[in-house]
């Protein structure tokens, strides 16, 4: 008699994905982020569901309903801050996951990679709409500034913006639709994650060496299940420390003031995880140019499989490419810092230089270095 785990139509899918899955024997802790992202998504859906039970998507009561959740609902403050800081953890893991993919050449699995980029875009849209919901000052003005960028699209721009707003400014209609989208998108993300995994399991995982690991595979369970549990523990400790000791560390104090269309905050900025893209947007003194640069800063990821000119897949044995990779990471940290600074000298110049370096490194320096390494190795 066959084991139910291997014969049951539903359980066997789980078995092939998480139990008997052949995995490379040498994947490092950098391969933990996929499961951590899955956990984050589950946590966000769960905490979000409980928040939605008490939240009202109406301009007059949205801010008060969030205050009510924090003050009057049992452990409402905990649910709210787990949701807010859970989003930050989500993006930290996303950026690590993408960085791992770039470093070890995982983008050569083009289907999996492109699905991942679409996942990133959808997650960014979800997070942006979620930030609007508490209807504080930064929620309102962030929504106004970011949606207004679409007006830079020639011909259809202004009409498109008013269509998204549901009126002539960010108002009740905007808040209601943003809540509807913010609720539905995580479920769409879950479906996309399943497709992402489907594509991944067609090829199997990459590994730090970048070489084929078919000759040395081990079962996912118990080896990597226990490893994922360890990663999960680290995540829970970090998240709960953040939630319990400094829940507002990553937030903006302006969002504790109710939205006021008649009073513009001195510095409008998004959440920290969008600051690098915001800095790129602001570094171009032209609206359409800025919007195109903003879109390119994310969509450039889709070009990585084409720009891969090295004969080796991974950067593990390519010291010059490693230097460029860490230069890119530092550059993104500088952009993140600049995105949170006021638009004045010297920040404008630093932002412009960092933005230029970002595109120059990814589009020109990295492919040229790969060719040079091939030459040095006489390949």
Curated annotation (Swiss-Prot):
Its cofactor is heme b. InterPro entries: Cyt_b/b6_C, Cyt_b/b6_C_sf, Cyt_b/b6_N, Cytb/b6-like_sf, Cytochrome_b, Cytochrome_b_C_euk/bac, Cytochrome_b_N_euk/bac, Di-haem_cyt_TM. GO terms for cellular component: mitochondrial inner membrane; respiratory chain complex III. Pfam families: Cytochrom_B_C, Cytochrome_B. It is found in: Mitochondrion inner membrane. One of its GO terms (molecular function) is ubiquinol-cytochrome-c reductase activity. A ubiquinone binds at residue 201. CDD domains: cytochrome_b_C, Cytochrome_b_N. PROSITE patterns: CYTB_CTER, CYTB_NTER. It is a multi-pass membrane protein. The chain crosses the membrane at residues 33-53, 77-98, 113-133, 178-198, 226-246, 288-308, 320-340, 347-367. Heme b b562 binds at residues 83, 182. Binds 2 heme b groups non-covalently. Keywords: Electron transport, Heme, Iron, Membrane, Metal-binding, Mitochondrion, Mitochondrion inner membrane, Respiratory chain, Transmembrane, Transmembrane helix, Transport, Ubiquinone. One of its GO terms (biological process) is mitochondrial electron transport, ubiquinol to cytochrome c. The cytochrome bc1 complex contains 11 subunits: 3 respiratory subunits (MT-CYB, CYC1 and UQCRFS1), 2 core proteins (UQCRC1 and UQCRC2) and 6 low-molecular weight proteins (UQCRH/QCR6, UQCRB/QCR7, UQCRQ/QCR8, UQCR10/QCR9, UQCR11/QCR10 and a cleavage product of UQCRFS1). This cytochrome bc1 complex then forms a dimer. Belongs to the cytochrome b family. Component of the ubiquinol-cytochrome c reductase complex (complex III or cytochrome b-c1 complex) that is part of the mitochondrial respiratory chain. The b-c1 complex mediates electron transfer from ubiquinol to cytochrome c. Contributes to the generation of a proton gradient across the mitochondrial membrane that is then used for ATP synthesis. Heme 1 (or BL or b562) is low-potential and absorbs at about 562 nm, and heme 2 (or BH or b566) is high-potential and absorbs at about 566 nm. This is Cytochrome b. It comes from Ctenomys leucodon.
